[in-house]
Amino acid sequence: MESRSVAQAGVQWCDLGSLQAPPPGFTLFSCLSLLSSWDYSSGFSGFCASPIEESHGALISSCNSRTMTDGLVTFRDVAIDFSQEEWECLDPAQRDLYVDVMLENYSNLVSLDLESKTYETKKIFSENDIFEINFSQWEMKDKSKTLGLEASIFRNNWKCKSIFEGLKGHQEGYFSQMIISYEKIPSYRKSKSLTPHQRIHNTEKSYVCKECGKACSHGSKLVQHERTHTAEKHFECKECGKNYLSAYQLNVHQRFHTGEKPYECKECGKTFSWGSSLVKHERIHTGEKPYECKECGKAFSRGYHLTQHQKIHTGVKSYKCKECGKAFFWGSSLAKHEIIHTGEKPYKCKECGKAFSRGYQLTQHQKIHTGKKPYECKICGKAFCWGYQLTRHQIFHTGEKPYECKECGKAFNCGSSLIQHERIHTGEKPYECKECGKAFSRGYHLSQHQKIHTGEKPFECKECGKAFSWGSSLVKHERVHTGEKSHECKECGKTFCSGYQLTRHQVFHTGEKPYECKECGKAFNCGSSLVQHERIHTGEKPYECKECGKAFSRGYHLTQHQKIHTGEKPFKCKECGKAFSWGSSLVKHERVHTNEKSYECKDCGKAFGSGYQLSVHQRFHTGEKLYQRKEFGKTFTCGSKLVHERTHSNDKPYKYNECGEAFLWTTYSNEKIDTDETL
C-alpha cells in the first residue's frame, strides 16, 4: 500500500479502491454553492472533513492514481516553502496571499495536465489552520476519465451543511478514495471562513479601496492592493536593494540576478525562470486563447491581458503619477512610467554593460549578443527574437488592421501603434530629454536621442568595425556587406533592406501625402519628413559637431559630416575599388557600372539613376525655382546653378593654405596642390 505525507502531522493518504464509511464522530460537508448543480451520475463538486472531536480518521475522496498524468512541470517545481519559524512571522494577510498564489499555480498546472490530481505539501500551517483542496468533478472508475480541479481554502472556524446522508446508495463501485489518518486535529466551533469562499461564486466584492474605488472579494486582496498606493514594500533584495510587496515577488525577482531558467519549451527550446511563464509561452505555439471578452468577443491567451483589455471598454484609469499627473489603467504601467522621472536603470547587461529600466528590455537586448531567433513564421519561414514580433509579423500575411484612428481613418495592426499615431494629431510629447529639454511622442525616440548626448555606440560591425548607437542600425548596416534585400515591392519588384524603406517606397506608387506643413502647405509621405522640413522654417539645428561646432537639422547629416574629420571610407566598390564614406554613395556609384536607371519621369519618360536627379529634373516640367540670388533677384531650378554666379560676384570661398590664393571651386584648389607637388 503506497503512502504519501500531507499537511498535518502524522497524516497519510492511502488508495483503498472502494468507498468506506467514515469513522465515528466525522461527517462529510460541502460548500452550498458547489452543490447547486448536484448530479450523482457525473460525480459531486467536492467536500471537506469537519473535525468535531478527536478521532482516528476522516474520509476524503481523490482521483484514481492510475490515471494521473506525468507532467513536465510539477507543483513542487513552482512551490515556495516556509519553515515553521518563517510561517509564524507572516501576518494573516501575507498568509492569505501565499496560499492564494500557491493554489492558483496548482490549479493552472492541473488544468493543462501538467500536474497530477493529488496535492502534497509540508506542515507549513499553524494549529489554527486547515488546508483543503476540492475536486470540481470526480473520476468514474468505469470510464477512466481524468477531470478538472477546483481549489479553495477553509481556514480557522467553519461549518458546512451535511451531504453524507444524500450519498448513501450511490457510492459503491464509482470512485477511488483516500483515507487521512492522523494523531490529532483541533476542533472548531464558530463559522467564519466559509463566507469569503462563497464570494467567489456570487462575485460579491464588498472590500472597496478608498484611494481609487477598486472593489475586492477578500480583505487580504484589498490589503495587497492598497500597497500599490502606499508603496509599502517590506521585502528587500540584497543584490540590488529593490523592494517588493511580498516574499513571493522578491523570490521571483531574484531569478533575474541568478539567471536560473529550469523550465524549457519542447517546441522551440526557450527556457524560463518560472513554470507559469512556460505555460503561458506554450500558448504561442498552440494558439490557445481561453480568456474571452464578453463585451466584444476578443480572446486572449492570458487572463492578465483580458483584464487589461476590459479597461478599454470601461475607460477607468485609476493609477495616477504624482510627478506629472498622467493616469494609467494598471499599476504596472504607472510603475514603468515613474522610471522616466527617476532615470533608474537597475537591469544591466553582463555582456556589454548596458543598463535598462525594465527587465524585459534586458531580456530583449541579450538576444542581440546571442543572435537566437526561436520564433519562426510558418507562412514565410522568417524568424524573430521575440514572440510579440512574430505575432505582429503574422498580421502582414492576414492584412488585418482592426485599430482605426477616429481623426483620419488610418488603420493599424495593434493598439499601441494607434496610440502612438494619435499623438501626431494631439501633438502630445510626454517623453522629455533632461539634457536639452527636447520632447518626444515615444519613449523609444527619447532613448535614441539620449545617445546623441552620451555618444554611446555599443554595437560594432564585425566586417568593417563601424559602431552604432542602436542594434537595429547595426542590423541594417550589415545588409550593406551581405547585399541582403528581403523586402520586395509587389508593384515594381524593387527590393529593400528594411520594411521601413519598403513602406516609404510604396508611397511613390500611391502618391499619398497625408502630412502637410502649416507654414507653406508642402505635403509629405511620413511624419518624420514633416518634422525635418519644419526645421527649415524654424531654423532649428539640434545636431552639433563637437569637432568643429557646425550644426545640422538632421542627425543623419551630422553623421555624414563627421566622416570628413575622420576620413573614414568603409564602403568599397567591388567593381573598381573606389571607397566611399556612406553606403548610399556606394549604391549610387554602383549604378555607373550597371547603368541602372530605376527612377523614371512620368511626364517625358526619361530615366535617372537616383531619386534626387529625378526630383531636380521634374522642376523643368513644373517650372519650380527654389534657389534665388538675393543681389539680382534671379532664381534657379537647382542649387548648383548658384555656384555659377560666383563668376559674376568674384566670390572665391576656397583658399589654399600654403600661399593664401583663393579659388571659385574646389577642383581649382586641388589642381594647385598637384602643381606644387610636381614642382
From Swiss-Prot:
Superkingdom of origin: Eukaryota
Pfam families associated with the record: KRAB, zf-C2H2, zf-C2H2_6
Main location: nucleus
Gene Ontology cellular component annotations, sorted alphabetically: nucleus
KRAB domain span: 73-152
InterPro entries, sorted: KRAB (IPR001909), KRAB_dom_sf (IPR036051), Znf_C2H2_sf (IPR036236), Znf_C2H2_type (IPR013087)
UniProt zinc finger (C2H2-type) residues: 205-227, 233-255, 261-283, 289-311, 317-339, 345-367, 373-395, 401-423, 429-451, 457-479, 485-507, 513-535, 541-563, 569-591, 597-619
SMART domains: KRAB, ZnF_C2H2
Biological process according to GO: regulation of transcription by RNA polymerase II
Subcellular location: Nucleus
Glycyl lysine isopeptide (Lys-Gly) (interchain with G-Cter in SUMO2) crosslink site(s): 280, 476, 588
Tissue expression pattern: Detected in prostate, testis, and pancreas.
Gene Ontology terms for molecular function: DNA-binding transcription factor activity, RNA polymerase II-specific; RNA polymerase II cis-regulatory region sequence-specific DNA binding; zinc ion binding
Keywords: DNA-binding, Isopeptide bond, Metal-binding, Nucleus, Repeat, Transcription, Transcription regulation, Ubl conjugation, Zinc, Zinc-finger
Keyword Secreted included in the entry's annotation: no
Function: May be involved in transcriptional regulation.
Family membership noted in the UniProt record: Belongs to the krueppel C2H2-type zinc-finger protein family.
Protein name: Zinc finger protein 283
Organism, as annotated: Homo sapiens
Gene expressing this chain: ZNF283
